[in-house]
Structures are given as structure tokens and as C-alpha cells.
């Protein structure tokens, strides 16, 4: 072992020694030092290369050192540039001189030119294949030594080419991006050249926003939105004025334009597509060349709009974007979260504060003098039951430059919504128990609407402001408050504030301060509100009463708290309900003037309390919504029955609230208490300018919002602005309290309904009457009403001439004008296509939705308005509602109200202004204009409804064409028509007023739905109400619901509160209803109003007005679809019986609302008929027809109108806009509501009916009775059409049936009116279709019936439709029921006196038998009504005479249930006849009418009077017979061609509505009726 170890040791040593030897040998050689240094350098360089790739931490440290060094020399600058290039993965090198540094990549290079001192000379960028171009932005950054920004530019250039494919493909993609940028730049220049817009306008409205071209590495930037808070300096809080040179890239919301690779292939243009330098339209759309293989290439890339921060958008918005671009927004399904939660995160991310805020969706805002707490209810259910969901988007794909403007508009809309919601999100921390901390709940209602609920600043109640972001610059606002709540502010005011600040906290503070100001300025308001509330409480119908049932409408009030939660339907439903109830509320507020007087007059107070019973119903419907009794109705009722009261009320003209709040239309709006009109989203502009700016321009932006916008406009303009009045009814805080009380009470509720349904469209109505009245008009209106009551003429007075109504805009005239202004109507109605005023009126009537709210209100009113019913003489319900507000005997009380109602109607309520004479004077020429300006007023005036012959009916008809259209519009708009109708009828002496009230229109609008409901419910007003909680038409509800209507109708279940005995005994001799006459007329009118509320009710009303027989018929109708029908009949009847005698008949017929459907509805009708006859030949003609057809059409009409209406609007049974839309359909489709209205101011709903009615009128007086029932609704002019319509209905053709030359003559006279009605009649736009619409109406009725079933949901959603559908709905119900109870309708005895004592069954004092079972059977034909549509058409078209002739046949047909369908058709005919009858009115309704209108009108008046007297007797007999045979089969009724058929038809409709088994009337009935109608009309003449 030892030897071995030694050996190893020796080996090691030897190795070591050999190694050392070798080392010595190697290094012993002398090497130069230079070689050693070289070796060291090599090693060092290798280390640097290795470190750059492998030691990032070391590199970052070196870069930090570089940044810390000051660049003061050329080497330092080049070193820094090379360092930046390395950071971005780019190469760099210096030029030989060392003064140029090149930063390079495969696709581009940047050349930085320096001087020897290191100072920057220039920076150029050269893209692949291009010459270098100097970049000022890069020069600026480097001169300022801003190397970070320079580095960002380099990064941007790199990302620009971060595309798939080789360099050649990348070059094509760059060319595509360049061509896109060139096109967008051209679009920006085109916009600027066309508008010379400044930076802010470019940002908010520019087709491509504010465009900043691509520069260096910054992509092309489109600045598309900036909020008011963005324009405030963060440090000084002073506003920033934008100039071309101070718009920073970071300001506001921006999107960059780029191109990115995609997995799919897209055809992208590689050359500019814009040809020329001028846009091809007013939207600055350029002319693009088509995509071809020459100018485009398929690339695996696409254009993108990219956002710096992901934007929260709703699920619906994502779908809209994808529909716009045609390209999926996300490659994979995105995750959705509550939108409000995303908006909250987005807002909080703007603050650099890293500390998370534990907000739990509750945020605090500290404002000067106020502290707010906002709870964002992110999980609130929408109508579809789901919460509002959203997601984040960071980029949007598109292929064509033409898509960019569309995309930007969508994004602006979403961002504006986000901005409002985000304005509540603040990091402010406050203690929950802080004293004076105000609580607000923000609840989503849809992707563009939300509600802010808070406690009323003065009262202990909940208030809700619904904001609808129509687009980025228009926000429409509706304030919903209790009927008796103190004024807060107007919708216009709120909208102006919102649009100015786009901040909810700032807006809430402004609202509170405004409310405090108003309270300080109007100390009497609270007293008035209390008085009204007490009165209402004393007289409120049972909660189950129709009015309450209508709480659907009331829901809005409760909905106010949380529109979404209040209504089962969902936030939107609630919203709509809210609007309805608000409108109702408005009406109640409308009593403001009265209340004000009350507060000042202890005697007045006591009187009101004594009589409050009748009036209280009006407010009740709205009240339920806000659980606030409708003070207004009681007032109306009280004043109606007390001349002293009237005088007291009218003595206060000086105190006009208009004057009080005149300066602030907004306040006036609010006053209406329905301030949160359903038009909720109508006027988006409201907020921007608090008071000065006129929102009308902005309003127009959205049709749904149109209503709202109009409201805004009127508010801005001031009480005088009709639009404002119309739209602002709900918003009109001031006026509603005062004058609008009756009007508002009665009709406004109806309007809200349409608005809620908007369909937006809303949009809009509630405001109409309330708002109008609210203005200074209130006092005038009240005084006028008193005067008018004393000298019936005053009714027409309100809207003597276009000028007058304008003058009285704030009061009723203006309101009406405004209301019926195309604008206004458009606002409410999506489709306000009526070129003809008649169409507008029809629309107004056809806006039952709008009226529906009124109806809701009326519903209540009707329920507790049996007395009113008597006063009204026609429909216990609708009329009562209306009456209560405008007509019930409280002429004084509702002086303002009546005027307002008239305004709504379009009839100048300020009869005092025009007086009968004035009305007359304006009748012809003014009529047309008036009609346009004030549907009701105009129609009334032209018809000389003042004359009272067809008075309200005739005027309605006259208005019917033009006026009706307006009325319709109005009704739609402000629900004022309904109000008006009441008012008009209430004024009674105001045929014009009646016309104005075209309660048919308004009511029709509301009523039909109600009717539908009522029909569906059959007899339970309450049910009816509840059926459409949201927008139960007051009128319709009222008619149906109240004992009178409902009672009368088979559905006693309506369980209406006992309706005081309403004995409308109007001296026959009085053509012009004096005060008493006026009362009855007003009563009639009220009925009409009610009717107007409901489509078919409207018809019924008209009928009542038309003749006693109509009234009776109405009764029958009532039995059938009594609830709604009655109202309708009554209402129209009262309108029809503008003349004293008519009024009387109306009164009589109204006398026993409860007695029988007819009694309630028909009574009025009968009286109307009689009155109408006195009117004169045309009047007579029209009236008789009217009186009979009115009722029947009224009843049948809703279905018909609905149907037809439904055509255009019908499709929208669930579509509020459509239904409510003032489309020709609406108006022409009078059958639906609109049809009738179209023909005549009030004819809208009775258009179809009118037609039938027309025939009826023409037929013998006895026939007349029936006809009146069906035609009354339409009025004389309408009647012609109606007959024709009826005929058409039975035949299924409108024009085919021209039975008599005499009828033709009548039709010719009415033609214009008819024509007007016609277009309305035709759902679409055709005037002729008016009758047609009726036909359609029938189908509609079935549809409406469905509506009835779906009513609540649909109601909201189709408030407008509802107007139509309402009409239709009633009609539908009617239709269904009509078919079932057609007989009932056909044999009805119209009792002028409806004495229904507290639940007692109505007794008929004066009976007129509606002898046309055929009429009833006509209902059975209702399905034919669709065909009948044609007859409706004639009404509308110039060929009306022919159609009208046919109409007579139809009149016979009236018995034929189609009249329900006919309802519309009849309505049209009726309207035509009405127009004819009330030439002036007709003129109103129809411009052409004016030619023959004046002389014929006078003649009509006289002849009509005679005919009326005859008819009255006849009607009484018929009524008796009818009473006997109310339930009798239609056949017996059919025996009486005119009266029976038409009346039956109408009645039948009504009856059907009442759930009476429908009897199918043979077609032949139509023929007989036509003949009879013709005879009556001729004889009457």
C-alpha cells in the first residue's frame, strides 16, 4: 500500500512541474501591451451585448441614469435617442456627420435632425414607400425635451404596423387606413362648411365629432362627447371656452381610428370613397362611391374605433351597434353585469385615488345649502323582469367610413346616459344621520330612461322625476306628483336644468329650490290643494270604482317612488302608469284656479264641498295613482251645478294662475300635477335652458319625446304657447291647480295614458289640458266658462278663431291650439302624419292613450259622478269625468277647467271670449284654422257648436275633420281633448267646446282602452281601471266604471260609487245652452269627454250629444259596453248636442247615466241629437246622424277605431306610439279614436262611428236617434262618413255604399270634415281610411279586446295606441261584446235624465228609443268593419260624399256591429257629418269645410235645431223603446235604419263593451240605417 501511495504522489508532482514549465515557456515571450488592451476590450464588448439581452434589470438601471442626465449636448441627445429606440425595439444609427439620428424599422423610419450644439432642427417620419414628412408634434415634444411623449409616439408607430402578414400586406393595410382617414377628414370638413360649427358643436353634433388627424404615432382622434363638467376648469371651476387651438386630446370622450388584424377577412377600401365635396342630405352625408375590386381589397384586418378606457354600455346598445355595423362586437360572448355597477366603476376609475370606496351603490353629494344621498338601484327590474345589464367595450369594428357617424351617435347616446347616472357617483363621504340629508333613489326604467324618486319638498308624499335620454343633447323630463301635492316645477324647467348641467344632483337641487320659490309665490296653493283633497276624499268613489280601477293610471303616482317597482309591468310600465296618473293628477291640479278661488272664497269653498260630490270623480282616477284624492273633479262637479259657484270662480280671472305662473310655463306644467307626464321622454331639451330656452326645437328630436318636447316648448313659450299647454299639462304645475282642474281632472288623465304608452310617443298628452289651463288662461277660462255657461256661446268663444285660441293658448284656446298643433300632436303621437287638421284631431281622439290617462282620471270621476253623469247627460263615466272637470255642472268651477277642456278639445273654452257668436263667427274659416290651432275649440267654433245644434258634436265633427284632428292630437297630447271634450260639452253652449273637447277624441283615445277594459271587464269600472292600472282611460274608465256608465252598462259590477242623479234637463228651446243649457251641454260634453277618453266611448258620447235617441242608444250601448260606450256616447252626445236643445237632450240622456247604458251614455246622445238637429240642415243632418251613430259608433267605434287605428296604430295595440300616434290612422281611424277625431275634433275616435252617425243623422229623426248614438260621436260631418262607414262596414267597403243622394249632399257638406276624418279614419294616412279604420277597428276591437286582456301591459306600452287601442280597446271590447251585445246596443232608449241615486239603478226620465236592432247587429258585423274601413276612408277622402252616401247604407249598417269597427268608420262618417252639420266645426276639422261651412253651419244650426227637436221627441220615444229593448235583439233595433242601425251600432258597440252578448246585426240593417239616416239628415236640413 505504501509503495502504491508513493507512486501517486510522485506522479502528481511530475505533472505539476510539467505544467509550470509549459506556462513559463508560453509567457516568457514578450507580447506588446496593445494586444493585452485589445483582448480586454473584446471581453468588455461581449459583456455589453450579453447584458442587453440577459440582464433587463441592469438595462433599466442604465436607462434611469440616462433619464436623470440633462441633455445639453449633441452626444447626450444622440445617446438618449438611441436609448429610446432600444426601449421600443427599434434600430438606430447616426449619419456620418453625427447630426442626424435615424430610428428605423421595417415599415417606417424617423429622422431627427440636430445642429452641432445638440439643438433640434426637425423631425421627419417616413412610412414604407413614402417620402419623409415633417411632424410638428414630434418636433414640439423633442424641443421641450419631453422624451416620454416622444417614446409614446414611437410606440404608436410600432403598434400601427403590428399587423399580420408580410410587409406587402402591411402596406395594403396602411393604405386602407389612409383612405379611411381621408374620407373621415372630408366628412369633418363638410360638416364644418355646412354649419360653420365651433369646436363644441363639432364634438356634440359633428358627423365625425371633433377630428384630430393622425400625427406621428398618435392615431386619428374623434372627440365625440364632452359633458358640462368636462368644460369646467379643475382648479378655478370656471368654464372653459373651447377654441380651435385649445381642444386637448384628453378632453371629453375620445375614440381613435385604426386598423387591426382579425381572424376573418374583410373587404376594406384602399382608396378614398367620398366623391365630391358636398353632402347629399341635411345630415351631412357625403356621396360614397361603391365598393369595387378596384378600390378595395380583402384583408385579414378591419377598421376599429378604439377607446382609451372601456365604456360601459347596455345590452341593448351592444345589439344596436352590431345592427349598425353588421359585425359582431365581441369575438366571444361578453360577460354582463348590472350597468349601474359598471358606470360606478367607470366613474371611480377616473380618480387617481387608489383607495377603494366602500359605497354599496350609495353616494353622497354636498351641494351649496343641501346634502344629498343617492342610492343607485342597480338591480331594479325592467319591464321584462330583468335588471338593466351592461358590459364594457373597448373598441368597435366597422368596414365603411359611412358607419362612423351612426356609431358615434349611438355612443354619444350611451355616454350621455352614463354621464347622468355617473353624476351621482362621488367620493364624498357624509354621515347617514346628517341633519337635512335628502334621500334620492335612481332607478333604471330602460336603457335610456331612469327615474329619480324623492320626497316632495313641501308635502309628505313621494315625487318622481323620469328622465329620458333621447340623445346626447336632449333629455326629456317628467315630474310625477300627487294630485293634491303642491307645485314643484315644470317638466320644461327640469329638462332645461338637466341639459344645462347633465348632473342629477344639480338638477335635484334646482327642483327643490324652484319648489320653494313657487310655494313662496303662491301661498294659496297649499290651501287650495287641501280643500280639493278634502272634497275629493268626501266624494271619492270606492277604491274599486273604475276611476280607482284606473289606478293603473294611479300607479304612476305610486310608481313615482320607483316607477319600476310600482307597476307590475316593470319600471317602464310604472313609468307609463306614472305618466298616466300624473296626467290624472294634472287634471286634479288643473283645478288649481278653482282651488285658488276656493281658498279665497269661503262661500265658494262651501259650495264646492256641497257639490263636490259630482266633481270628485274626475280627480279620483288620477288620485289613486298618487293615492291623492283628485280635488279637481269635485270642484268641477260643484261648479257645474252651482251658477253662483261658477260666478265665484270666474270672478277671479285676474288671478289667473297663468299670470301667477305664466312666467314659468314649467311651473304651470308642474301645476298640472301630472307633471311627470307620460310623455316622460318626450322633450329631451327641457333641461338645458332652465326657462329661457325653448325646448320645442330640441323636443322635436324624438317623436316619442315629441310630446314631451312640445310640452317643453309650450312651457318655454309660456302659458300662451299651445304646445306648452298641451304638452305641459302634467308639467303645468301652476295651471293645473287652477283652471285645469276640471279639464285636467277629466281629460288630462286620459292624455297621460297615451303618453305613457309612447310609445313614446309618446309620447305624450297629459300636459295638454292641464298645462293649458294652468296659464293665465285659468282665470279667463273660468270666467269664460261662467259666461259661456250663461250664454252657451262662450264655449265656442274659447276657440273662436285660430287667433283666439292662440291668444287663449294658456287658457283653453291656446292650449287647444297648441295641443292640436301638429307639433304637439306629433309630440304625443309618434305618427302625427295627419296633414289634415281632421287627421290631427282624429289623432287627438285617436290618442286615446293620452286620453286614457284622462280616462283614468275620469274613471274615478265617472265612478263617483253619477250626478255628473246626469248633468252631463250622457255617459255617466267618461262624461262625468269630463263633466266633472269641464262640463259637469261646474261651469264656474271649471270655467277655467271648461275652457281648458275646450282647449284640450280645441274648442275655445273661453266662450266668454268668443261667446256663441264668436264661436260661430270663427266657425267657418276659423274653424279650420282653429281646428288646427285648437282642435276642440276650432272644431267647435266652426261647427258653431256654440250653436249647440250639433254643438259639441257638430263642432266636434267640424273640428272633427280639422278640429278633430287637432283634438285628437290634443287629446293625445294633453289628454286635453278628453278634458276639452268635457269642457266643451260641459260648456255645452260651446258646441265648439264640445268639439274641442272632442271628448271623443280624447276620450276615445282613453276610453277605448278603458272601454276595452270595461268591455272586457264588462261592468266593473274598477276592473277596468285595474285592468289598465297604468293608463286606464279616465273617460273610458269613468264611463264604464262609474255607476252611470258602468251601471248603465251590463257591468254593474263596475260598482261605481253611487252616481248622483244626473238630470240633464236642458230646455229644448235653447239652442245655445244657457247656463243650465250649458250645463247640460257641458254635461253632454263631459260625457263626450269621457267618450273621447275612450275611443268607442267617445263615439257613444258623440252619439248622445247628437240626439236624445243617441243618448238612449248610448244607454243601450252602455248596456252593451256601457261603461265605455256610455261615456263615449254621452260625451259625444254632449258634444253633438252643443245646442241647448241638444244639450238638454244630452242632459236628459245623461240624466240617468245609471239607468241604462244608453241612459248613461245614450242620454246625452239623445239630447245631443236633438240639439244637433236645430243646428241647421248640415247640423241637423249631421246631428241626427251624429246623435244616433255617435252612441253606437262610440261604442263600436273604439273597436273599429281601434281596429283601424290599430292598423297603423293597431299594430301598436301594445305599441303606444302607434296607437297614440297621430297618424292618419289615428286621426282618420277615428273609429279607433283617431278616425272619429280625424273627421271631427271630437270625431277622432268617432270617425268610424261618425260615419255611421252621419247616416243616422241624415235618416229620419227617429232613426236619427240611433244614428246619433252611433254617429253622435262623430257629429254631423262625421255622421255622413259614419253612415258611409257603417255601410262600408256592413259591406266591408267604404266607398261602395253610396245609398242616397241626400246623404251624398250631406256628405258633400261634411266631406271636408269627413275627409279629415277620413285620413284619420284610415289607419295609415288616408283620410278616407277614417271610415276604413272603423272597419279595421272591428278587427282592432278584437285586437283591443286582446288589448283588454293584455291591457295593462299594453296600455302602458301602447298608451298612444291605447288612445287608439283605447278606442279600439273599448271598441274591441265593444266589438267582442258588441258582437255579443250588439242587440243591446241597437235597441236602446236614451234617457236624457240619468237619475242614478247612490248605486240605485239609473232611471231614465226622458227616453228615446234607439230602434235599430240592426245597429246592434251591425256590431256583429264588426269584423266587417275592417272592410268598413273603406267607409271610414270616404269620410276622410274628398270622395267622402260618395262614401258618405255609402255611409248612410252603413248607417243602416250602424245597427250592424261593424259599427264598432264602424265605430271608427262611423266616427269618420259621423265626423264628416258633424263637420257638415257644424260647418264651422267641420271647417275646423276639415279645411275645405270652411267654404260651405259658414252658411251651411248657420243653416245647419237652424235646421238642426228643428231636427233636434223632432229627433228629441223621436229619441225620447226611442229611448223608451230602447230602454225596453235595450237588451232587445239587434234586429228590432235594426228596424230603425238610421237611428237604430247607427245608434245600435254605436250602442251595440257600447253595449258590447258592456259585456252584453253581442248580437250580430244583419248587413241589411246598414242599408236601412243609411236610408233613415239620409232621410233624417235631409229632413233635418
Curated annotation (Swiss-Prot):
Q: Region (Interaction with TP53) spans which residues?
A: 1249-1421
* Stretches for region Interaction with ESR1: 16-590, 656-1065
Q: How is it modified after translation?
A: Phosphorylated by MAPK1 or MAPK3 during G2/M phase which may enhance protein stability and promote entry into the nucleolus. Phosphorylation increases its interaction with PSIP1.
**One GO cellular component term noted in the UniProt record for this chain:** mediator complex
Q: For bias kind Pro residues, which ranges apply?
A: 622-632
Return one Gene Ontology term, BP aspect: positive regulation of transcription by RNA polymerase II
Give positions of region: Interaction with PPARGC1A and THRA: 622-701
Outline the segment boundaries, as ranges, of region: Interaction with the Mediator complex. 108-212, 215-390
Residues covered by region (Interaction with GATA1) = 681-715
* Localization (cell): Nucleus
Motif extent (LXXLL motif 2)? 645-649
Stretches for region Interaction with THRA: 405-644
- Top-rank taxon of the source lineage equals Eukaryota
Where does it mainly reside? Answer: nucleus
Stretches with biased composition (Basic residues) = 1496-1505
User: From start to end residue, where is composition biased (Low complexity)?
Assistant: 1033-1050, 1077-1093, 1100-1111, 1119-1156, 1218-1227, 1234-1293
Compositional bias annotation for Polar residues: 655-675, 807-819, 1162-1195, 1330-1345, 1425-1440, 1448-1482, 1533-1552
* Bias type Basic and acidic residues, positions: 690-705, 962-973, 1352-1364, 1506-1522
Keyword tags: Acetylation, Activator, DNA-binding, Nucleus, Phosphoprotein, Transcription, Transcription regulation
Its function, per the record, reads: Component of the Mediator complex, a coactivator involved in the regulated transcription of nearly all RNA polymerase II-dependent genes. Mediator functions as a bridge to convey information from gene-specific regulatory proteins to the basal RNA polymerase II transcription machinery. Mediator is recruited to promoters by direct interactions with regulatory proteins and serves as a scaffold for the assembly of a functional preinitiation complex with RNA polymerase II and the general transcription factors.
- Report the family membership: Belongs to the Mediator complex subunit 1 family.
Name of this chain's protein: Mediator of RNA polymerase II transcription subunit 1
**Whose protein is this, by species?**
Pongo abelii
Instruction: List the top taxonomic levels of the source.
Output: Eukaryota, Metazoa, Chordata, Craniata, Vertebrata
Q: Which gene encodes it?
A: MED1
